[in-house]
UniProtKB/Swiss-Prot annotation:
Outcome following mutation: residue 278 to P: Loss of interaction with GDF2
Segments carrying motif Cell attachment site: 399-401
Leader sequence residues: 1-25
Keyword Cell membrane tagged: yes
Sequence segments annotated as region (OR1, C-terminal part): 200-330
Protein name: Endoglin
Domain (ZP) ranges: 363-533
Gene: ENG
Principal place of residence: membrane
Length: 658
């Protein structure tokens, strides 16, 4: 057996050989008191929210989610991740996320490939990195009006109130609620739609069990019942700083009957749980637990019965999906290894890296402006003694709530190139002996040119302005001269076919729209590329169209205020397959008319021959006159009473006109 699996294998053996518990009649004397973070810390991820709702809107074009976030004081940092899986090979529908906060937030947003529209208050939310999504300014409304504002744009799929979150995971397309309308209700379980981790760790308490000798310690985790009673698996990660070979810890897990446990521990431990449990190294091996008391006093009695002399951690949590326990010692003994050398600054000292990331760069009227808000500086506990450009004579102005540094492109040491104006922001901090420096840039938009090109092959060599239905087309967007400090991204594209064909969406929210639109790898110079396949399923086919794409130049590092958006377009000619002259792809019009006339002539000759044979083989006595009967009037009208449909088109549609 591998040595890495030996400790947990021993723990598994101990758990399976444990005796069933018996209740203690005597009162357990153990005064639970808060334990400092140096002795133990418990963090958790949960789907329980103070107020929330989940509703189903399967036919909605826009999936709407609303988050109300309450933070205690000052600016906070938040990680927000959106997850979505492809459905039938295509990206999910468009998403509107409404973000309402009560104070300043540094937001790290991850929504890769999701067609996201973000509504937020730009004066309170600061992105640590450019978001790369469509944004909308959120009006300053109370909660009820924000919900109404969001509902006007589409049925709300989920809404939740969270108190001081550190990270949020929002899963799209996972709504399992039975409601058709989302209305906030107290103490809700968001299920798989939303999980979040509170910033403040759970309250950890501990005590000494009287009358028990030895050094065995107990870690007790009590998970409280949630709003829903569906089966749940709680992953419990335990990390104890114990010497290898020690076997003096017991883990007691108590929860509702529908909760099972998946244990991931780095140390040999005796396991005592309700429900069923398994170990991470043997996830398929489920072990039946015991019936344990559901009160703190009863669980302390279990710990004493298991000969634990110390309750190192006692934690009560809402229904969680992941719980992490970190304890600095084991068995009641002090840690013998030397204390680790501190390599990161304490939380109450200034972080120069984060401070420099808060400098906002604005470019307008042939001038560069740097802005640094004092509120954010104070929250980081930084004391600034100076903010200048590379030229120290160009100093920032103190405008009450912010520092503002402004200069024309022709002064303060600006470096002007064909595509960019560059300088350096220099910040002097009281706690640092050397100044902090950061490169700042402005784009010279007068010198930039955006081009949209259509190609007939994936090699992008032969440019064209003609597309043919059923033939794949390749598109590339370029900016010249290239700007290495900025990233060129494709936000949206559509093909306008006029009143006959309407508009065909190709790309929305940086995601392919349809299963025959493919986002390709960028060119070696970083130019975005994609391909599409177009079919028409009614006639007549339009002869021209306009391909329009919206692109964005986003800084690889820095503020989203420097983003530049442009729309480029090109006129396209559309060749109908039956007029292309390529006989291998279909018969041209003269050939069709010739075949039709030939078939008519052959049919007429055969009919005449049959009539001649019939008339000459019958006896004269049986011949009867032929009476011509006029066809009903309705037959003539029915042959011409057909509907003429308008032209419709779609990327990769397989329908055809009968």
């Amino acid at each position: 057996m591998d040595r890495g699996t030996l400790p947990l294998a021993v723990a598994l053996l101990l758990a399976s050989c444990s005796l069933s518990p018996t209740s203690l009649a005597e009162t357990v004397h153990c005064d639970l008191q808060p334990v400092g973070p140096e002795r133990g810390e418990v963090t958790y991820t949960t789907s329980q929210v103070s107020k929330g709702c989940v509703a189903q809107a399967p036919n909605a074009i826009l999936e709407v989610h609303v988050l109300f976030l309450e933070f205690p004081t000052g600016p906070s940092q938040l990680e927000l991740t959106l997850q979505a899986s492809k459905q039938n090979g295509t990206w999910p529908r468009e998403v509107l996320l409404v973000l309402s906060v009560n104070s300043s937030v540094f937001l790290h947003l991850q929504a890769l490939g999701i067609p996201l529209h973000l509504a937020y208050n730009s004066s309170l939310v600061t992105f640590q990195e450019p978001p790369g999504v469509n944004t909308t300014e959120l009006p300053s409304f109370p909660k009820t009006q924000i919900l109404e504002w969001a509902a006007e744009r589409g049925p709300i799929t989920s809404a939740a109130e969270l108190n001081d979150p550190q990270s949020i995971l929002l899963r799209l397309g996972q709504a399992q609620g039975s409601l058709s309308f989302c209305m906030l209700e107290a103490s809700q379980d968001m299920g798989r739609t939303l999980e979040w981790r509170p910033r403040t760790p759970a309250l950890v308490r501990g005590c000494h069990l009287e009358g028990v000798a030895g050094h065995k310690e107990a870690h007790i985790l009590r998970v409280l019942p949630g709003h829903s009673a569906g089966p749940r698996t709680v992953t419990v990660k335990v990390e104890l700083s114990c010497a290898p070979g020690d076997l003096d810890a017991v883990l007691i897990l108590q929860g509702p009957p529908y909760v099972s446990w998946l244990i991931d521990a780095n140390h040999n431990m005796q396991i005592w749980t309700t429900g069923e449990y398994s170990f991470k190294i043997f996830p398929e091996k489920n072990i039946r637990g015991f019936k344990l008391p559901d009160t703190p006093q009863g669980l302390l009695g279990e710990a004493r019965m298991l000969n634990a002399s110390i309750v190192a951690s006692f934690v009560e949590l809402p229904l969680a999906s992941i719980v992490s326990l970190h304890a600095s010692s084991c068995g009641g003994r002090l840690q013998t290894s030397p204390a680790p050398i501190q390599t990161t600054p304490p939380k109450d000292t200034c972080s120069p890296e984060l401070l420099m990331s808060l400098i906002q760069t604005k470019c307008a009227d042939d001038a560069m402006t740097l802005v640094l808000k004092k509120e954010l500086v104070a929250h980081l506990k930084c004391t600034i003694t100076g903010l200048t450009f590379w030229d120290p004579s160009c100093e920032a102005e103190d405008r009450g709530d912010k520092f503002v540094l402004r200069s024309a492109y022709s002064s303060c040491g600006m470096q002007v190139s064909a595509s960019m104006i560059s300088n350096e922001a220099v910040v002097n901090i009281l706690s640092s002996s050397s100044p902090q420096r950061k490169k700042v840039h402005c784009l010279n938009m007068d010198s930039l040119s955006f081009q949209l090109g259509l190609y007939l092959s994936p090699h992008f060599l032969q440019a064209s302005n003609t597309i043919e239905p059923g033939q794949q087309s390749f598109v590339q967007v370029r900016v010249s001269p290239s700007v290495s400090e900025f990233l060129l991204q494709l936000d949206s594209c559509h093909l306008d076919l006029g009143p006959e064909g309407g508009t065909v969406e190709l790309i929305q929210g940086r995601a392919a729209k349809g299963n025959c639109v493919s986002l390709l790898s960028p060119s070696p110079e970083g130019d975005p590329r994609f391909s599409f396949l177009l079919h028409f399923y009614t006639v007549p086919i339009p002869k021209t169209g306009t391909l329009s794409c919206t692109v964005a130049l986003r800084p690889k590092t820095g503020s989203q205020d420097q983003e530049v958006h442009r729309t480029v377009f090109m006129r396209l000619n559309i060749i109908s397959p039956d007029l292309s002259g390529c006989t291998s792809k279909g018969l041209v019009l003269p050939a069709v008319l010739g075949i039709t006339f030939g078939a008519f002539l052959i049919g007429a000759l055969l009919t005449a021959a049959l009539w001649y044979i019939y008339s000459h083989t019958r006896s004269p006595s049986k011949r009867e006159p032929v009476v011509a009967v006029a066809a009903p009037a309705s037959s003539e009208s029915s042959s011409t009473n057909h509907s003429i449909g308008s032209t419709q088109s779609t990327p990769c549609s397989t329908s055809s006109m009968a």
